[in-house]
Regions:
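Conserved C-lobe activation region of Hanks-type protein kinase-like domains
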Residues: 176-179, 188-249
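Conserved end of the kinase activation segment
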Residues: 164-178
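Conserved structural core of kinase catalytic domains
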Residues: 46-99
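The N-lobe alphaC helix and its flanking beta3-alphaC-beta4 segment of protein kinase-like domains
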Residues: 20-48
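ATP-binding glycine-rich phosphate-binding loop
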Residues: 1-25, 43-44
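C-terminal or otherwise distal, non-catalytic regulatory regions appended to signaling enzyme catalytic cores
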Residues: 287-294, 298-437
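Activation segment/activation loop of eukaryotic-type protein kinase catalytic domains
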Residues: 123-165
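Catalytic-loop of the protein kinase fold
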Residues: 107, 111-130
Length: 437
């Protein structure tokens, strides 16, 4: 990135972003204006500059202080079913609805101050377990400094509205709130529909579904009421749009089709109001407390998806029925995947061992030495007998026999010691192999 973020010992609730190289003069003016206009409302929803940092007194702006964002994760950890089941297993759809509402509120706060987010993408929104949303990377926002526009000149194609898909660059281009409102609607759709993209689905015409950017540019909203004409339909076993009340369905239709360009997309304030109202119109399924859905529906949509093997929410506290008629493999597997894995086993490293050698017992010679001594004494005795041929050398016969007997006994003791050590080594090796297998 263009800079690095550091903790500040004296201000534990703030961090400092320091640029690798001092930004241009216009960017310095932008940061100075943002720091001077910070207020409680902005700081509640945005990691907004609180003070500029300079290389010296009266020197160039080299960075800024901003609120520290802790205890929060990127928003995709919430709307991705797999990640949510792992990290937030007790969060049902009403939690997601509140997150979506808070996303809209963060946009509304920025817009009320005359600014535009510009580079809307999933990595710029952090969410906590209390559903609170904080926008980061605010120094890239399009800022209106008392009539002077500091443009946002970056963007992500998958969050770029259809009317801007043909732009080769955002350099010198002025964004509007209506452009932001496209990205806002897309984020809300992601959160409420399990991470699905509204322009991704099953192709109905030959050139649809090849590139997401192309489908966005052609307004191929897969969940539209006229999606047959547009060329895409929703993926199989996905959350149906009919889960939402008709007025919220219409808001998505307005946001993702041509009418949103012509007459404007739903504003952030409109989304806050609509989602707050929807939050008051929820009910729980009688089968699972985790199945929360809008009250206008007769049947539970989550149960219907469960029966298709698509598990969005897991009731970890329910009684598991194991009869063949009520067993759903996907549900059991989802519960398995939601469990927290034990920490990785810390294997002992060979370098950490400091073995100490154990010498042979006293008086126990190695077998090779015993054999050499026996051979040498035998050869000497035979030589003397052959040369002298005297009877007195006959006494060497029992001496040689004694040497052989002692050598044999010593050799057996040596073999037993070696066998004992070999067995100890094999046991240690088996224990180690079992540990690492």
């Amino acid at each position: 990135g263009e800079g690095a973020v550091y903790d500040i010992e004296e201000f534990v609730d703030s961090v400092a972003k320091i640029y690798h190289t001092p930004p241009p003069a216009l960017k310095q003016d932008k940061l100075a204006f943002m720091a001077a206009t910070a207020d409680a409302q902005l700081l509640n929803y945005v990691a907004w500059p609180q003070a500029t940092l300079h290389g010296g007194r009266g020197g160039k702006v080299i960075g800024f202080m901003m609120p520290k964002v802790s205890g929060k994760e990127p928003i995709h950890m919430i709307y991705s079913p797999a990640h949510r089941r792992q990290s937030y297993p007790h969060c049902a759809w009403d939690f997601l609805l509140y997150v979506a509402r808070n996303i809209a509120s963060s946009f509304a706060t920025v817009h009320e101050h005359g600014h535009v987010v510009g580079d809307v993408n999933q990595n710029s929104f952090m969410v906590g377990r209390d559903s609170k949303v904080v926008l980061i990377d605010s120094d890239s926002f399009q800022i209106n400094a008392n009539g002077t526009l500091h443009l946002c000149e970056v963007g992500v194609s998958h969050f770029t509205p259809p009317e801007l898909q043909t732009l080769s660059s955002f350099v010198g281009f002025e964004r509007t709130e209506n452009h932001d409102n496209f990205g806002l609607a897309l984020l809300i759709f992601h959160v409420l529909f399990g991470g699905r993209h509204p322009y991704s689905g099953v192709p109905l015409i030959s050139d649809a579904g090849n590139a997401l950017e192309t489908d966005i540019a052609h307004f191929r909203y897969a969940y539209a009421s006229d999606n047959q004409r547009r060329g895409l339909k929703p993926p199989p076993r996905s959350i149906p749009l009919s889960m939402l009340p008709g007025d919220v369905e219409a808001m998505f239709q307005q946001a993702f089709t041509e009418s949103g360009v012509a007459t404007g997309r739903p504003t952030a304030k409109a989304w806050v109001a609509a989602l707050d109202l929807l939050r008051q119109q929820l009910k729980k399924c009688t089968v699972s407390a985790m199945h929360v859905y809008p009250a206008h529906l007769t049947d539970c949509p989550w149960c219907a998806l469960d029966n298709q093997g698509v598990i969005y929410f897991i009731d970890l506290g329910e009684e598991v029925i194991t009869t063949s008629g009520d067993f759903v493999l996907a549900k059991v597997w989802a519960m398995v995947m939601a469990s927290v894995a034990p920490p990785a086993l810390q294997l002992p490293l060979p370098d950490h061992f400091q073995p100490t050698g154990r010498p042979l017992p006293l008086g126990l010679l190695r077998r090779e030495y015993i054999i050499l001594i026996e051979i040498a004494l035998s050869a000497l005795s035979l030589l003397l007998c052959g040369l002298q041929a005297e009877p007195r050398y006959i006494i060497l016969v029992p001496v040689l026999s004694a040497i052989w007997i002692i050598g044999s006994l010593t050799s057996k003791a040596y073999k037993a010691e070696i066998q004992q050590r070999r067995e100890a080594f094999n046991r240690a090796k088996m224990d180690y192999d079992h540990l690492v297998s």
